[in-house]
Design a protein with these regions (language model features):
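Carbohydrate-active catalytic/glycan-binding domains of CAZyme proteins
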Residues: 1-267
Length: 267
């Protein structure tokens, strides 16, 4: 078994690292210069074929500001390299008539008889959302979920509601050992207008399935800043967010990595 981590080094391209045992370290970065864009994500099919999906410019001429595309490459697992040329599988986004913007953050899954492509759309501000498509093969043809978006806080909600959570999107899905599906995504808690001191928070919500499509949150339903604890297997480590107690004697030569977080204090 091999573990992979792929990401964007802004201004320098996209790369991945791999490991047989993440606890013992990772390979040197392996750059993928064929990827022209951001947000790369791996998918490895049951037959061993690898794929990379990512955000990139549309093929040909851009028709409006904010129009982007989702591209797919085949990936050679043995050669650690991309095979051939990309294929544009989403152009602009879903429901293209109103000119959707900033389709990005793609993830590819194989669930049942379909391949699912889940993407963020609308930018990471107040119009942020998550949309999904499905196809019989990773190369398509892709069918949009008629009920997109499957997660958003942009419409049908009062801006004066208490404990406002906004800008929800950039999600990923995982199935637990008990068979339940969960989604993690980012959202923000503004204290006024579009200002927030905590940046982007990470949220967890259950995923429900209907007619072969996943839904993270009903349209018009507000995200609660506090949810019920998920009945998932604990990893035995003390949490470092939310309400928690943690003791550190600081008797080692190096600071525990648990103290690395957004906006570290200078002392």
């Amino acid at each position: 078994k091999t573990f992979y981590m792929i990401t964007t080094n802004v201004g320098r391209g996209n790369f991945f690292v791999k490991s047989k045992n993440p606890e013992k370290g990772w390979s040197d970065p392996i750059y993928l210069p064929k990827i022209n864009g951001i947000d790369p994500s791996f998918f490895f099919d049951k037959n061993g074929q690898g794929y990379i999906v990512h955000n990139g410019p549309v093929d040909g001429t851009t028709e409006y500001n904010g129009q982007r595309a989702i591209r797919i490459f085949k990936f050679d697992v043995k050669g650690d390299s991309i095979v051939g040329h990309h294929k544009e599988i989403v152009r602009g986004g879903t429901h293209v008539e109103p000119h959707p913007i900033w389709i990005e953050g793609p993830h590819l899954y194989r669930i049942g008889k379909y391949y699912y492509l889940m993407c963020a759309e609308g930018g990471t501000g107040g119009w942020h959302s998550e949309v999904i498509l499905r196809a019989p093969t990773p190369m398509g043809p892709w069918e949009e979920n008629p009920h997109n978006p499957i997660l958003t806080q942009r419409t049908g909600l009062s801006p004066q509601r208490p404990n406002v959570v906004t800008s929800a999107g950039h999600a990923d899905m995982v199935q637990s050992k008990t068979g339940d599906w969960w989604a993690v995504f980012l959202a923000c808690r503004p204290y006024e207008d579009d200002f927030y001191n905590t940046g982007r928070d990470t949220y967890l919500l259950p995923v429900t399935w209907k007619d072969g499509w996943p839904e993270i949150l009903e349209k018009g339903k507000a995200i609660s800043p506090i949810g019920e604890k998920a009945n998932l297997c604990p990893n035995g480590e003390q949490p470092m967010s939310g309400n928690f107690c943690y003791h550190d004697s600081f008797d080692g030569q190096q600071l525990n990595s648990r103290w690395m977080f957004l906006r570290n204090p200078s002392a």
